[in-house]
């Protein structure tokens, strides 16, 4: 059956980035009718695992879009940060624009039982699966991760034993849930693993922090692989410390078991003042382009030499009454990714005054030119 719900969308003011917990949806004062689709069948995609290299795989992922501020809310309510419930119609529109990959950020701690079992709620696993199937039914790749669980995933030697135990149990359950699915389902062990609130949080962390993050990735990959079946060879994205691109972060990054099916996951809101802080609304000079190109050259030099495929799991720019500059930045950024075989996945938090380029209430593109530029780069 289909249930029809009336959604009254109010003006909400908040501040959001891909890493914050204060959220908002796209502004509108319309009364919009949204159809809540029936649960998708879980057999819509055959469990095919292709014999394809990670680099070929990432090229086939094309360009991607993040369903931000929904399943990753730091609350039991997925609408707590202002976005509506996710419908198949939303994901259909993302696919119709030409995006081939959906990154599905998921926060698990509000849907997890107590120690020592740390059982994940069945209904929550089913919710994640249902939205994943929205993407899969459109022949899209879908990335499922552990996102805003930083409260308990603290990278210190003191915390490591308990965290590793819980990560092992979480990923065992997630991996078993999706084991029958083919390789269009991708796992991402951790979003931006870091010591939240520490002085070095966004500066590459400490040697201890980087070491422990590597350990957390290790147990996560081991847990996924141990479930067997399709998960024995499934592509897994593994992030650097805080998903950063700094010198110390890249230097200390370790691929668990030198696993050939691990894909590097990084994020870069560059340049910071334009993309994230929103205090410099202009972009596009030769110097701007040279600085961004240099960052991508550093990424390429590191991972090309190691034969690793790379996904840019989050990037974007905030709105500061500067649509032309944002378009120029998006075109240049997405093409830098495409030239290096990197899949660019735009961070969309649902807020048109920040990173939102798609209105999930009206199912319309607020900034279609930006979306088209991202998609066209990887065609």
Question: What are the language-model segments listed below?
Answer:
Residues 15-18:
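C-terminal motif of bacterial Sec signal peptides marking the signal peptidase cleavage site
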Residues 27-101, 373, 377:
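N-terminal carbohydrate-binding accessory modules
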Residues 45, 82-102, 116-148, 152-189, ...:
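An active-site-proximal structural segment forming one wall of the substrate-binding cleft
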Residues 67-86, 114-120, 159, 273-292, ...:
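Acidic/histidine-rich helix-loop elements
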Residues 77-96, 167-169, 292-299, 326-331:
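Short, acidic/polar
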Residues 85-107, 296-303, 336, 340-343:
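Catalytic domains of carbohydrate-active enzymes, especially glycoside hydrolases
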Residues 165-280, 285-288, 295-317, 339-340:
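Active-site region of glycoside hydrolase catalytic domains
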Residues 289, 293-367:
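Substrate-binding cleft of secreted/luminal carbohydrate-active enzymes
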């Amino acid at each position: 059956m289909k249930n029809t719900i009336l959604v009254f969308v109010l003006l909400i003011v908040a501040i959001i980035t891909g890493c914050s917990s204060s959220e908002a949806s796209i502004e509108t004062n319309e009364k919009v009718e949204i159809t809540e689709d029936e649960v998708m069948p879980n057999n819509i995609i055959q469990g095919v695992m292709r014999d394809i290299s990670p680099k070929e795989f990432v090229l086939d992922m094309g360009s991607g879009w993040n369903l931000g501020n929904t399943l990753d809310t730091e609350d039991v309510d997925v609408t707590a940060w202002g976005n509506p419930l996710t419908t198949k119609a939303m994901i259909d529109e993302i696919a119709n624009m030409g995006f081939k990959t959906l990154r599905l950020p998921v926060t698990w701690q509000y849907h997890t039982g107590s120690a020592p079992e740390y059982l994940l709620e069945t209904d929550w696993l089913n919710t994640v699966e249902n939205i994943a199937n929205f993407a899969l039914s459109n022949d899209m790749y879908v990335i499922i991760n552990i996102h805003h669980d930083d409260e308990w995933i603290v990278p210190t030697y003191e915390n490591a034993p308990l965290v590793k135990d819980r990560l092992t149990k979480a990923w065992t359950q997630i991996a078993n849930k999706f084991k029958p699915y083919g390789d269009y389902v991708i796992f991402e062990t951790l979003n931006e693993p870091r010591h939240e609130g520490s002085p070095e949080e966004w500066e590459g962390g400490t040697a201890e922090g980087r070491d422990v993050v590597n350990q957390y990735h290790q147990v996560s990959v081991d847990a996924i692989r141990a479930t067997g079946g399709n998960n024995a060879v499934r592509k897994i994205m593994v992030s650097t410390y805080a998903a950063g691109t700094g010198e110390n972060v890249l230097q200390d990054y370790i691929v668990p078991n030198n696993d050939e099916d691990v894909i590097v996951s990084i994020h870069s809101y560059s340049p910071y003042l334009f993309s994230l802080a929103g205090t410099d609304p202009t972009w596009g000079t030769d110097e701007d382009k040279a600085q961004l190109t240099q960052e991508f050259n550093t990424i390429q030099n590191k991972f090309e030499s190691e034969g690793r495929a790379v996904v840019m799991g989050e990037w974007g720019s905030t709105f500061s009454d500067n649509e032309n500059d944002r378009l120029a930045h998006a075109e240049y950024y997405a093409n830098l990714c495409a030239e290096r075989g990197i899949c660019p996945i735009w961070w969309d938090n649902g807020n048109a005054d920040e990173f939102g380029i798609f209105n999930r209430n009206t199912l319309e593109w607020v900034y279609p030119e930006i979306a088209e530029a991202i998609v066209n780069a990887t065609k």
